[in-house]
C-alpha cells in the first residue's frame, strides 16, 4: 500500500487471512524498511500525530442461541507514539499494548467478558463492561479487580509523556485494585461507584521527575490563568504574605473546611461518596457541574498539574494524591496551611492574608464569623465574588441558606454556641479595596 500526503511518502505492507467459512479475520500492518507507520490526514484534520511499528488484529465470529453473537480476537500494537495537545504537551509513548477479548452481543446488550485481558507494557488486568438497553434507557456497568501485583509493574508501565511528574519513579511492595461503576439511567440515584487501590509494604524508593514531598518545605508556587503564569511566590516564611496555620482565625479555617471538605483530616485523599454524588448530579443536569474534589485533590491539581490541563491530568492527579496520602509525604496540617496560602480569593488575590486585607482590611487572625463564612463561600468562583453582592453593597438574601448551614457546622464543632449560630446572618462590611 503506497500512501502519499504532501511531501511524505510511505510504503505499508498488510498481511493476513480472511476466511468466510470459518468466520475469521486476521491482519497485520507494518511499514517496509523497518520504518514507523504514520497515520495520514489526522494531523491536518485534528492536529494529532499517530505513529506505530506494527498493528495486529484478529476476530472470530460465533453465532449462539437466541440471536446472540460472540466475537473473540486480539488487537496488538507496538512502538505506539501519539501526540495531541489535548492529551499531553509531550509525545505519549507505549512500548506494547495488547487486548485479547471476548465480546457478547445480543439484541439489546453488549458485553465485554471478564475473560478479556489487557496487557499494558508490564501490567495486565481483566476489565468487564456491559451495556444494556431497557425501555429506551441504558444501564452501564464497568468493573476491574486486580489482585496483588508488584507496585513497580504499575508505575513502570505508565506511558512516557502522559504522566510527566511520575516519570522515573521507583517503588517497592505490592498493590491491589478494585473498581466498579454501575449506572442505570432509569434510576440515577442507584448509581454505584467504588474505587480502591490497596497497598502492602509499599514504599517510594526514588522520586521521578518531581519530588512529591515538596509541599513539606518552602517551595515556589506559580499561579496560572488560561495556561499562562500570572504570579509566583514562595509558600513559607520568606514570603511577606505567608500566614502560618496557627495565625489564621479558627473560624476561617473551619468555615473553609466545612465548605470544601469537612472530612479532610480523616480521609486518605478521596471521598468515593462525594464522587458518586457528583456523578449523579452531573448526569442529571447533563454537564460537568460538580467534581467531588477533596482539598488534597485541589492541592495536587494546583501545585503539581497546573500547566497541564488535559485528559490525562485526572489520572495523574489521582495517583499523586494516593502517593502523598498513603506515604504521608506531607502532613495534613501543612497541606491545609499551603491550601489557605495559595487559594485564590479574587482577581490576582492569593492567600488568606491578601484576602483578609482585600475585603476587610484585617489580618487573618482578626476575621469574624460572618467574614469567615463569606470568604469560604467565594473559593469555588473567586473572580465572580461581586455576584454575591446586591447593588447597595450588601450580601444578597440568597446567601442566608449557606450562612445558616456553615454557622450550624461551626456550632457542632464547638467554635460558636448554638445561640450565636442562630443569630448569624449574611451581613458584612467590606472595608478593603474589593468594592
What would you call each of these model-derived segments?
Residues 2-435:
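Juxtamembrane regions of bacterial inner-membrane/periplasmic proteins
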